[in-house]
């Protein structure tokens, strides 16, 4: 007769197999004394170089959680409107806030649904959401900080390479053409 823990250990085995098959780096995290097994999975990206997703395997389900970005500095209403609208199009995960306002993706799947394809779908959705939404969240919630960083780098002759995705936000004396500031 199979016990609940047999099901948990089977799910853990399936998850680890799926992560290895996808060549994803992961490690076990045991820093919380609640009895859940947690795996921290590193999802490589382009817009955001790395997103860590935590898979918490419990007696009945697997909880998925990934930090997306810190609490916005400005335009909270615009950021939250974007997140709520985006939630309508996401599969198996949704945006939420923690108690300080940082933005996370969270989801849950039953242990019975855990297989290699489902793990791939869920982690794929996390990665797709972060890759699609990260720059938009920065534009909406950190526009002033981006402008200040751009100006600071210009004043010191620093590279703007990793800010080029935000060049359209920079309006130098009203002309809107940030391309004159592009540096290799």
Curated annotation (Swiss-Prot):
Pfam families: YbjN. InterPro entries: Put_sensory_transdc_reg_YbjN. It comes from the Bacteria. To M.tuberculosis Rv0487. This is Uncharacterized protein ML2442.
């Amino acid at each position: 007769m199979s016990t609940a823990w047999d099901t948990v250990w089977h799910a853990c085995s399936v998850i680890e197999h799926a992560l290895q098959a996808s060549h994803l780096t992961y490690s076990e995290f045991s820093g919380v004394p609640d009895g859940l097994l947690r795996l921290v999975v590193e999802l490589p990206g382009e817009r955001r170089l790395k997103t860590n997703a935590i898979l918490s395997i419990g007696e009945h389900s697997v909880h998925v959680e990934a930090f997306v970005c810190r609490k916005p500095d400005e335009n909270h209403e615009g950021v939250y409107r974007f997140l709520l609208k985006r939630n309508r199009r996401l599969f198996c995960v949704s945006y939420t806030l923690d108690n300080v306002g940082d933005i996370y993706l969270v989801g849950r799947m039953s242990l019975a649904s855990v297989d290699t394809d489902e793990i791939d779908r869920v982690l794929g959705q996390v990665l797709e959401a972060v890759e699609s939404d990260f720059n938009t969240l920065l534009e909406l919630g950190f526009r002033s900080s981006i402008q200040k960083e751009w100006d600071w780098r210009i004043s010191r002759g620093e590279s703007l390479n990793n800010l080029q995705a935000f060049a359209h936000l920079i309006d130098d004396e009203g002309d809107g053409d940030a391309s004159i500031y592009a540096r290799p």
